């Protein structure tokens, strides 16, 4: 009988932060809907997922805690998780926090960065971040500016004339140097920048920061751009060969090799949650849709991180349109294989799936290999248990009587 406590999973959520460092996936923040109320997840909790054993664990955090938020931008440099911006009960944020993920005693302590040079971006959420040369490079997002701060890099959505505050979408670029703790806004040297936007996606390949899609006003986009992170020149909209993904926001873009990007999910222009996956090859300048993905499991405002063997780990997000039916937050982990696994990984998976049959032989393995096998057995035991629980939950939901409106 499986122990439910041992196979616990991080709570359902959307708009959270997630990064991979070493053998672990780290998840913090976000929100969930409870009885039609948006509830932020506790700011003093971080969940870790052991990629080898498939086990989740919750850690209580200390230090200068960020507020409980959604729409923050999380990025990892040298084992430190940096969280910038977001939205909480008090409004939009432009504060920057970090936590060391490589602690020896398992204690995670937040630090708020208050001593820095330069000017940080204006408060915003749903922005993106490129990590390049120990720098955090932020682009876009939705937030507010005062009348004196209005520039061409801002599309106004709403305004409070009494307070001289304007809300809208950004397309500005800001850099935080983690070594010198300095904020700067680089001078864009050329090219046509993307429209202001939020809920877009980004990824880094080489010295280029790619941007895809997002929303401005009532328009969702499917344009692809890159910014040269050395010369600060925009590419302009990239004309691709062949078919392209649909217009969308709240999707993810992940670098999977030196020349390929993986795009998944989002909300399309018709407000329909998406479950499609695409790979963009920057060498051939072509998109290719993956046909083997589970189309019954759409996701939006999720996170997608690259694992040790180039698998994509998608966690959380919503399966519903957050703008109208905000109930379908998820906590299952979708793993998409983008290339063949190593021979060792394939063998470990085979043993893990057939542990009962191979029980008498497993104990004969060398100690180092035995440890890997035992973790993989735990991985598949946990995966099967969670699958059974998910099926039962779906059957229960499907069998509930529906109330029809007259």
Swiss-Prot record:
Compartment(s) of residence: Cytoplasm, Cytosol
Molecular function terms, GO-annotated: ubiquitin-like ligase-substrate adaptor activity
Any single Gene Ontology cellular-component annotation: cytoplasm
One GO BP annotation of this record: ubiquitin-dependent protein catabolic process via the C-end degron rule pathway
Kelch repeats: 24-76, 80-134, 135-181, 208-258, 260-307, 311-361
Pathway connected to this protein: Protein modification; protein ubiquitination
Main location (coarse class): cytoplasm
Pfam families per UniProt: Kelch_KLHDC2_KLHL20_DRC7
Alphabetized UniProt keyword annotations: Cytoplasm, Kelch repeat, Repeat, Ubl conjugation pathway
Key word Signal present: no
Quaternary context: Component of a CRL5 E3 ubiquitin-protein ligase complex, also named ECS (Elongin BC-CUL2/5-SOCS-box protein) complex, composed of CUL5, Elongin BC (ELOB and ELOC), RBX1 and substrate-specific adapter KLHDC1.
Function: Substrate-recognition component of a Cul5-RING (CRL5) E3 ubiquitin-protein ligase complex of the DesCEND (destruction via C-end degrons) pathway, which recognizes a C-degron located at the extreme C terminus of target proteins, leading to their ubiquitination and degradation. The C-degron recognized by the DesCEND pathway is usually a motif of less than ten residues and can be present in full-length proteins, truncated proteins or proteolytically cleaved forms.
Protein name from the UniProt record: Kelch domain-containing protein 1
Lineage of the species this protein comes from: Eukaryota, Metazoa, Chordata, Craniata, Vertebrata
